[in-house]
Design a protein with these regions (language model features):
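A short catalytic or substrate-binding loop motif that flags glycine-/basic-rich loops and adjacent residues
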Residues: 1-3, 98-101
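Short, flexible, mixed-charge acidic loops at enzyme active sites
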Residues: 26-27, 79-84
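Nudix hydrolase/Nudix homology domain
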Residues: 29-34, 77, 88-91, 99-160
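Short, flexible active-site-adjacent loop segments at beta-strand->alpha-helix junctions, enriched
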Residues: 14, 26-27, 72-75, 113
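N-terminal strand-loop-strand
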Residues: 1-35, 63-64
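Active-site donor-binding loop signature of nucleotide-sugar glycosyltransferases
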Residues: 25, 38, 130
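The catalytic Nudix box helix
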Residues: 36-81
Length: 160
């Protein structure tokens, strides 16, 4: 099986401290690891629509800004039988080894609303300081979900 994912790095600044949302994966039979909101896109669902849906299901938040959305081009109206969307995400990933074959994109976002206590197969969506994520990653990178470990390392290197 091959999957395509759309994932969110939801940011805010409190004072001079940058924070992002992480949550704990709570999928039956799977390990409980720290992850970013997001998930699989449905057939013919756009990356942005999947991102908005997954963030709402998992965190309860509404996305109010998606970095790169201004680059979005779609071909709707040109050929009624075939539509394509192109957009510039923050980062893209591809698994190159492991039990799940997937590709996906990360978008930097801003959100509004109240966090859920638990969402769709997730627990404790919460704001964490970026510097704390950096410390946690250095201390024990395996506490993060396999895919998001790479996404977070990329973010920590290129967040500027």
């Amino acid at each position: 099986m091959f999957y395509v994912n759309s994932r969110a790095i939801i940011e805010r600044t409190v004072g001079d401290r940058a924070e992002i949302i992480v949550q704990t994966r709570n999928k039956p039979g799977g390990p409980r690891r720290i992850e970013l909101p997001g998930g699989r896109i449905e057939p013919f669902e756009s990356l942005v629509a999947a991102l908005v849906r997954e963030v709402k299901e998992e965190t309860g938040l509404d996305l109010v800004e998606i970095e790169g959305e201004e680059t979005r081009i779609e071909t709707a109206g040109i050929n009624p039988d075939f539509e394509v969307e192109c957009i510039r995400p923050f980062a893209a990933y591809q698994t190159t080894k492991g039990p799940i074959d997937s590709v996906g994109v990360y978008f930097r976002c801003k959100a509004a609303g109240e966090l859920l206590e638990s969402g769709d197969e997730t627990l404790r969506p919460r704001w964490v300081a970026v510097e704390e994520i950096r410390r946690m990653m250095a201390q024990d990178p395996l506490q993060f979900a396999d895919v998001d470990r790479a996404g977070l390392l990329f973010y920590l290197k290129h967040q500027g």
